Amino acid sequence: MSIALLAAAAVIIICVLINRVSNKIGVPVLIAFIGLGMLFGSDGILKIPFENYDFAEQICTIALIFIMFYGGFGTRWSEAKPVAAKSIVMSTVGVAATAGLTGLFCHFILKFPLWESMLTGSVISSTDAASVFSILRSKKLGLKENTASLLEMESGSNDPCSYMLTAIILSIMGGKISGGAIVYLIFAQFAYGLIFGFVIAIGAKLVLQHFKFSTEGFDAAFVLAVAVLAYALPSAIGGNGYLSTYIVGIILGNSDIKNKKSMVHFFDGLTGLMQMLIFFLLGLLSFPSALPKVFPTALAISLFLMLIARPIVTFGILTPMKCSIRQSLLVSWSGLRGAASIVFAIMATVTAENLKNDIFHIVFCIVLISISLQGTLIPFMAKVFGMVDNNSNVLKTFNDYVEELDVQFIKLTVQGEHPWKDKRIRELSIPWDLLFVLIIRGDQSIIPNGKTKIKDGDIVVVSAPEYHGTGDIQFTEYKISSGNKWIGQKISDFAKVSSNLVILIKRGQEVVIPRGPTDIEENDVLVLHVPEKIDITKIKKD
């Protein structure tokens, strides 16, 4: 057990370090995860025997749940809405057309058996959301014509259709399904997936908005459980769990819930971990010695997908929807194959009997080619097609983006002889660019106007324009340790011998805004505004 945990910890740490290096050199990190798995595998250096496809399928299915959920949860609907119709058609009709064209190519050109051809096409018909998200984020790749949102939503929502096609073809190959049953399967997949997705999302939204979690972070644990529930419930009765999970993700991600930004970051990290797991397992399951045999076939399918099938489908769908040629070209190139294709390939290997071709290793090579070639060249192709928008912020398409405001909020307590006490706001002489935004009076929050009277004990929040200095304001901290000569002295005494302004005092958990008569106490931390770096300990007291 300890050895297994050590190995798992080592793999995760190595993957995290590889991720940092990958971002610097521009090589997709998923290739490194696969390579690491191959090094650990039967043909690798460590030669760990692992051929349990059933176990791998179960683990990868769980991992894909969170990848699907994050595909919805991280998407900002306000940005995606203008291209939602295009994305949905691409993720349904586009997936089916891609599967069909690829299947026909495998059957007529590569001479695969018919249903095995269609199975291959179905398995690799969806694009990878996590890879697209990663490239857009890491490269801060702003794209014209709302293309980033189109790619994010398409890649985030097309796995359910690919899964459904794979399940149908596997049932046909097993001789377990009739024409009527196929129609019902399609109906059940979509209907139950949609119904459960919306119902679970609405229920979870109500809980998150009205239930107070007693422990910080339990809201993220609750959402994690909801993601699993969204997959399990429809799947138990023949529905599409991945579709349900995606719908729950996109509804919750675009609802007004507390701590949403931190939850997006949590699921971003979790999705990264799940990607590590899937691609490491792919490398672990693979036999590098088997790759040369299937590589020509995989290369032929990859080139057909990249240069023929994907462009035909993309232009066929987006041209009637009035998309520009350059946008269609970039969308065509950005159809990366990834985690879902791997999971469905493992599923096909486990379920299908008497396959004539090694679908698992073929998909392995296709994913490698897609990520290494297409993924690496997306930023370059965006420039070639004239689709880079340097004035747009791609991070706005994600739900953890917070608009930057050139304003700062300041809290003031009105007490004692404060000049604002018992005066109305309109009676005060204040700068035009200072705005009263909130008054806290006991347990009451008041949105003020000119007639509002400020009372003793009020906490007043005002806003003012933010200062954008470039290094001309510097701060340093001066700790008043035991025996310090300034203990018991006043701020006015300190000011007489120092050109530095004490802007605040950290006193335990309290922040004190100092005045001249304010006493300096032991363990205080004085925060000083210093015109230039000085040795504060050299300040002498007369």
Question: How would you name each of these model-derived features?
Answer:
Residues 1-391, 404:
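Transmembrane helical cores of multi-pass secondary ion antiporters/exchangers
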Residues 312, 319-330, 340-542:
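Cytosolic regulatory regions of ion transport systems
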